Amino acid sequence: MKKRITYSLLALLAVVAFAFTDSSKAKAAEALPLYYLQITGITSDGNDFAWDNLTSSQTKAPNVLKGNKLYVKARFMGYTKLTVITGKDGKNLLYNGTAKMFKSDAILGQNKVVIGWDKYFEIPMDALQDNSIQIKALSSGTTFVYSQKIDFERE
């Protein structure tokens, strides 16, 4: 008899818990392919990591960059399959481990659905082709989306 009452109470508890579950807290949606990519910040290890914010129309870093490591913040809107930062040898610095993504922050849209990412990259300046940086990312199929190219002066 005790077992029957225990099972009945557990079943009732499960029904009540299910009935009061708020399904609006977590939403899943099909990810949009990458449609926007912008470099939004730049700094270096010799600049005490003081970020210069960049707009989409800027093509030059406002301050001279010092040190050996370049730090870039980029905004990715939509889902990306592959990110490319090209080095002197024409190869992807992220793939070969020369550069690395060290942080990412989700960008939330309506109903707390992730719609993009702010990603932070560390790149050795000597590995770049010249004193400039541009990021490209694979959106869907074979379509690449490009950020603006940012030139910088180096001390």
From Swiss-Prot:
Keywords: Signal
Signal peptide: 1-28
Pfam families: DUF4879
Highest taxon of the lineage: Bacteria
Gene3D superfamilies from the UniProt entry: 2.60.40.2870
Classification via InterPro entries: DUF4879 (IPR032624)
Name used for this protein in its record: SPbeta prophage-derived uncharacterized protein YolA
Originating gene: yolA
